[in-house]
Amino acid sequence: MTMTDPLGDMLTRIRNGAARRKASVVTPASKLRARVLDVLQAEGYIRGYSEIDHGNGKAEITIELKYYEGASVIREIGRVSKPGRRVYVSVKSIPQVANGLGITILSTPKGVMADHQAREQNVGGEVLCSVF
């Protein structure tokens, strides 16, 4: 069966894994998912991730979730731009999450990046998700 929203599926797996206090979660691999995970790792929301290629054209990503004093570092994670309704913003209208305590991840012409990087590089794009 085909997946309508692969990025949304990955975010749901992370949310569910964190709710169940899992050490790691597994998701099918893609370039977009890996770029979003790069941002999450750089911002300190996950410990890391590793790609596993099974050789039959199906690769998986194992995401190591991060906890602080028994609670997940990720309190909320959600998709903003969805396949049925894309959300694009200019650099002036990039949303802040929790008054700057969280991040918004954007897909820009310069690559996938966090909101503060997009503001520094003066570039807008598609709002993929928000994390707090």
Swiss-Prot record:
GO term, biological process aspect, one: translation
Keywords tagged on the record: Ribonucleoprotein, Ribosomal protein, RNA-binding, rRNA-binding
InterPro entries, sorted: Ribosomal_uS8 (IPR000630), Ribosomal_uS8_CS (IPR047863), Ribosomal_uS8_sf (IPR035987)
Record-linked Pfam families: Ribosomal_S8 (PF00410)
GO CC, any one term: ribonucleoprotein complex
Subunit structure, as described in the record: Part of the 30S ribosomal subunit. Contacts proteins S5 and S12.
Protein family per UniProt: Belongs to the universal ribosomal protein uS8 family.
Biological function: One of the primary rRNA binding proteins, it binds directly to 16S rRNA central domain where it helps coordinate assembly of the platform of the 30S subunit.
Protein name (record): Small ribosomal subunit protein uS8
Classification lineage: Bacteria, Pseudomonadati, Pseudomonadota, Alphaproteobacteria, Hyphomicrobiales
